[in-house]
């Protein structure tokens, strides 16, 4: 194959619309699964996805970012149908490294690994309160501090998104109040 054209895979599961050179995809092209679950629009080099691209998923989400030698990696942006957006480092369309997630519920800024928060995270809520602490496998785990709108802060240990007692509330004037935390409380 040489030149511009549309190719359908032998099993009928995907199509490619773009340029061919010596039977290899080369230049701008569009590869789409017939099911609609995955559509890649971007450049090909020597039959591999390579360069800045847009990927549309069947659930309505859209990824924008680079591919290198047929692997998606580097800075990108993933926008979901509900308006939620993740911007930062990606690997295989998942946040991997430093990234920020923005939604109507607030902003999560932290370290991601294979699409999950793992490490230090700062969560800022629309009402101005914020949480700083550690996450493991997308859940709060370890010491975390909630900074409240009245100027006080609450320090607790978390296990799988559940506060562990005792917790300490520190008022704006520095008074420390130890208390038993209700389970799974969120701001």
What are the residue ranges of the model-derived segments?
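Glycine/tyrosine- and acidic-biased, solvent-exposed loop/turn segments at the edges of beta-strands
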Residues: 1-187
């Amino acid at each position: 194959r040489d030149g511009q054209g549309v190719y359908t895979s032998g099993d009928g599961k995907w199509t490619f619309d773009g340029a061919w050179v010596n039977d290899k995809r080369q230049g701008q092209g569009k590869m789409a699964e017939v099911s609609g679950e995955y559509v890649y629009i971007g450049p090909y080099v020597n039959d591999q996805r390579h360069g800045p691209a847009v990927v549309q998923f069947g659930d309505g989400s859209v990824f924008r970012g680079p591919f290198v030698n047929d692997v998606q990696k580097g800075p990108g942006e993933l926008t979901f149908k509900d308006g939620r957006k993740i911007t930062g480092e990606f690997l295989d369309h998942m946040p991997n490294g430093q990234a920020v997630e923005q939604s109507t519920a607030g902003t999560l800024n932290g370290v991601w690994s294979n699409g999950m928060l793992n490490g230090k995270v700062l969560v800022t809520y629309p009402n101005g309160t914020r949480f700083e602490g550690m996450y493991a496998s997308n859940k709060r785990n370890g010491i975390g501090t909630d900074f409240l709108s009245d100027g006080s802060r609450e320090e607790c240990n978390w296990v799988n998104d559940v506060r562990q007692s005792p917790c300490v509330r520190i008022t704006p004037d520095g008074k420390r109040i130890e208390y038993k935390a209700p389970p799974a409380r969120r701001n």
